[in-house]
């Protein structure tokens, strides 16, 4: 992991965040609200760099510790199918079209001040269009997703 690349500046991220949500309304209030929240998360991420470095140093131990609680997507999809739960965005009570699903998944990490594994994937350079497509393809192979 290139640590320096894991820490974009506010100047780098502001146009990305605002651009992702600009289409939601003409006034820009939605994109401004997302940026207001996101910049807090970005500042906290930057302030905690030493903790991330320690996490990386102990990553193998971390993986062993959490492995018993991590379930494979295939297991979760199988449980959902067995429960007759909706496994596709298109069959929800309020169906979501493919374009909106792709947008929501691609930019979900930019909308709020709540750190998730997707933020970690983004900051380490993993979360991109190709990765999102891989997730959608994997979901499709499980009769889930779009």
Where in this protein do the model-derived segments appear?
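C-terminal charged capping/lid subdomain of soluble metabolic enzymes
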Residues: 2-146
């Amino acid at each position: 992991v290139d640590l320096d690349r894991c820490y974009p500046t506010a100047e780098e991220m502001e146009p990305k965040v605002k651009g992702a949500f600009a289409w939601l309304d003409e006034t820009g209030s939605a994109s401004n609200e997302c940026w207001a929240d996101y910049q807090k998360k970005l500042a906290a991420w930057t302030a905690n760099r030493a903790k991330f470095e320690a996490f990386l140093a102990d990553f193998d131990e971390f993986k062993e510790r959490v492995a018993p609680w991590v379930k494979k997507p295939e297991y979760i999809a199988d449980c959902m199918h067995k429960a007759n739960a909706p496994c596709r965005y298109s069959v929800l009570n309020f169906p979501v079209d493919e374009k909106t699903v792709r947008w929501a998944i691609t930019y979900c990490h930019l909308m709020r001040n709540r750190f998730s594994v997707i933020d970690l994937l983004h900051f380490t350079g993993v979360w991109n269009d190709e990765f999102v497509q891989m997730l959608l393809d994997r979901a499709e192979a499980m009769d889930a997703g779009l």
